[in-house]
Amino acid sequence: MEPSASCLPGFFMVCILLKITVLTQVMSLDIQINTQIPDTEEGVLVECTAESLFPPAEMTWRDSKGNIIPPSSTFDSQDRAGLLCLKSTILLKNRTEGPITCSIYNKTTNQEKRRSIILSDVLFRPQYMSLMSNNLLYLGIYLIFILFLNFLKGILFCLTKRLVHFRKRMIKIKKVWSNKTRACCPLIWEFLEIVLFIAFLPLYLMFRIRVFTLDEAHILYNNWLWKVCKTLIAMMILFTVLILFLLWTLNRYGKMPCLSSMNIDVSTHDAEQNSSKSAKFQENYDVAGQMILETYEETIFCQHQESCEEYNYDPLLLSSLDALGTCEDEKFSQHQESFEEDEDLQSFSDFKIELYSKLGNLTH
């Protein structure tokens, strides 16, 4: 009897300790508080959720002065183990001073656990509410615009690398535009994307959900985030200016990588066209030169023949053939001497230059 009697106090003590441990463990679970902007109503919807609570338990909302805030909706359920799951929401249409507290009170254990949040005044502005209600729409438009710019950039890159028709059009555009104007196009393209990426960060920090767990250092955290944002913006702007300056310097000295490949392709294409044109022009030039020389020789021969026919020879000569031969020799020598003179040579060179210029105009 003594051993059994001595075990009873220990058994009851263990049961009490287990019960207290379970109850304290249940009440020590975290309370989750979420906020969202409803699409239909104006205001901020605050939701408090707690799970695995030992029944019976109550959930109440209080402001900074301790006044009870009536909930907009409540929900409770039990799991297989008999533990409660509570969920309560309130709709705040006006800004509040100080924290808002969600408390859970257990009547059996006479324990209460609280969780407080601070809502920023920005959440109650109409501009913020309209923006946050369509936050996914604005984010989708932003991403679509970025993808569209990158898609256009890829199309232009493929066209400049493969299609000859696009190169011909680019050659015409380059003849109209100056070198500085051509350099500004890729710079503006890259600068636009950089500006969009830079502008997204402050917009996110300005219109994000500013809900802080009650903490003495939440103001310091907020200021620290804004300082980090300003530092990042300053660094991005500085590096953007440096990159644009380097691109402008490279383009000024004709060493810009983005335009060098295009210039090389265009120069090779122009060289091929010029070589084919020069070959055709050389062939036409040789043929026309031979024709001019033949016609010039024929005119000289005709002039000699006419001069020989007009020549009055002596009938006492042995034969007319000898007279014609001597006449031709004399006229040929005279003509050769006349070509040796400066005036005749100058006229012949002028005549030749004039014929070549006419030939060049005909070939073009």
Curated annotation (Swiss-Prot):
Q: Where is the signal peptide?
A: 1-28
Which ranges does the record mark as transmembrane? 139-159, 187-207, 231-251
- PROSITE patterns from the UniProt entry: IG_LIKE
Enumerate the Extracellular topological stretches.
29-138, 208-230
**Residues in compartment: Cytoplasmic:** 160-186, 252-364
Q: Does the keyword Signal apply?
A: yes
**Cellular localisation:** Membrane
Q: Which domain of life is it from?
A: Eukaryota
The protein's name in its UniProt record: Selection and upkeep of intraepithelial T-cells protein 11
Q: What taxonomic ancestry is recorded?
A: Eukaryota, Metazoa, Chordata, Craniata, Vertebrata
